C-alpha cells in the first residue's frame, strides 16, 4: 500500500492512496495503532473512511508523524566517495535533522542566506513502523520507504575550517521528502529493496544509481542508529546519496531551479528552489563564525 500525510479542508491526517494514485481515503486510527500492525493485519487496521477524496484537493506533507525524528547518513555510496577521492568510512556518518528542515512534494525549497553552494542528493528513506526488537533483520521493523532529497550547503564551515553539519544539513525548509510511503509488501520485497534512483535539475540528469550499491545497508544503518538513539515508530532514516552531486563538478543549485528526485516504485519528488533568503544586518557578529586567528 501507499500511505500519505496530507492537509485538506483545514485538517492534517494520514491517508491511504487508491491504486489509481488520484484518490485517497482518510485513516482514522492513530499512527501508533496502525503503523506497527499494518504488516500483519493489512488495511483492516487503518479504520478507513468510506469517502474517497481527490488527491488534487489535498496538499502532500512530509510523511513524518508528529514527535518522530529524521536521521541522516552521509558517505554511504562508494561511487560518490571515489569521485571525491575519499576512502569508505569504518562506520556510518549520521546526524539528526529537525522537522523544520523538512518540506513535502511540490513545496518550495528555501535557499538559505548562509550558503552559495546549495547541492542536491537523491536518497532512499526508510520509515520505522515499530521499535527495533530481537529480529535478525532490523529492516523488518520498517513501515515502508519514501524518496528524500538531502539538500546540502556545501560551503558550510569553510570559514571556520571545520565540519558544520548544523548549517550543512539542518537549515529551515531545505529537505524535501515524499511524496508518500510505499510498504515493502507493495514493493514485493523483504528487507532492503534494490531500486533504481535518479535526480534531474531542470530536466537534466545529474544522478543515477541503485540502492543496492550502499556501503552500509538498511539493516546496519538501523542497528547503528538504534545503539545510540532508540528508534521510534515514524522515524525517518535517510540512507545516503550516490555520485553526481554538485560538490563533484561545481554545478550547484540556483534560485528558480526545478529539482526532481525519483526512485522506481516509490515515485517522484519535485520541488523548485526559492529566492535566496536575505538576513537583517542586525546581530551579524557570530553568524558566520570567526576566521582562524581572530
What are these regions (language model features)?
Residues 7, 72-73, 96-97, 119-129, ...:
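Short beta-strand segments
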Residues 105-143, 147-154:
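Non-heme Fe(II) oxygenase catalytic core, chiefly the N-lobe of the double-stranded beta-helix
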Residues 1-92, 258-260, 279-282, 286-294:
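N-terminal non-catalytic cap/leader segment that marks the start of a structured domain
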Residues 10, 53, 80, 154-294:
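Catalytic-pocket segment enriched in acidic/His residues
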Residues 88-105, 120, 255-265:
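Structural signature of FAD isoalloxazine-binding scaffolds in flavoprotein oxidoreductases
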Residues 63, 117-119, 230, 252:
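Residue-level "contact hotspot" at macromolecular interaction interfaces
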Amino acid at each position: 500500500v501507499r500511505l500519505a500525510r496530507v492537509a485538506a479542508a483545514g485538517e492534517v491526517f494520514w491517508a491511504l492512496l487508491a491504486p489509481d494514485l488520484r484518490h485517497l481515503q482518510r485513516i482514522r486510527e492513530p499512527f501508533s495503532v496502525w503503523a506497527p500492525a499494518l504488516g500483519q493485519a493489512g488495511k483492516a487496521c487503518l479504520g478507513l473512511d468510506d469517502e474517497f477524496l481527490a488527491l488534487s484537493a489535498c496538499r502532500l506533507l512530509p510523511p513524518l508523524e508528529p514527535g518522530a525524528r529524521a536521521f541522516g547518513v552521509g558517505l554511504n555510496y562508494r561511487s560518490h566517495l571515489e569521485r571525491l577521492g575519499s576512502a569508505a568510512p569504518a562506520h556510518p556518518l549520521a546526524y539528526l535533522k529537525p522537522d523544520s528542515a523538512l518540506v513535502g512534494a511540490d513545496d518550495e525549497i528555501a535557499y538559505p542566506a548562509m550558503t552559495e553552494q546549495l547541492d542536491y542528493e537523491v536518497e532512499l528513506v526508510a520509515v520505522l513502523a515499530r521499535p527495533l526488537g530481537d529480529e535478525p533483520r532490523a529492516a523488518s521493523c520498517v513501515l515502508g520507504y519514501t524518496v528524500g532529497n538531502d539538500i546540502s550547503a556545501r560551503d558550510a564551515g569553510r570559514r571556520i575550517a571545520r565540519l558544520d553539519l548544523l548549517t550543512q544539513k539542518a537549515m529551515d525548509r531545505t529537505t524535501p521528502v515524499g511524496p508518500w510511503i510505499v510498504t515493502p509488501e507493495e514493493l514485493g520485497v523483504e528487507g532492503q529493496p534494490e531500486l533504481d534512483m535518479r535526480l534531474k535539475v531542470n530536466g537534466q540528469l545529474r544522478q543515477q544509481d541503485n540502492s543496492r550499491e550502499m556501503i552500509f545497508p538498511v539493516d546496519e544503518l538501523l542497528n547503528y542508529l538504534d545503539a545510540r538513539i532508540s528508534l521510534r515508530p515514524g522515524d525517518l532514516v535517510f540512507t545516503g546519496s550516490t555520485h553526481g552531486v554538485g560538490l563533484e563538478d561545481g554545478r550547484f543549485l540556483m534560485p528558480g531551479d526545478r529539482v526532481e528526485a525519483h526512485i522506481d516504485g516509490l515515485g517522484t519528488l519535485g520541488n523548485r528552489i526559492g529566492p535566496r533568503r536575505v538576513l537583517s544586518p542586525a546581530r551579524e557578529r557570530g553568524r558566520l563564525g570567526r576566521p582562524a586567528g581572530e
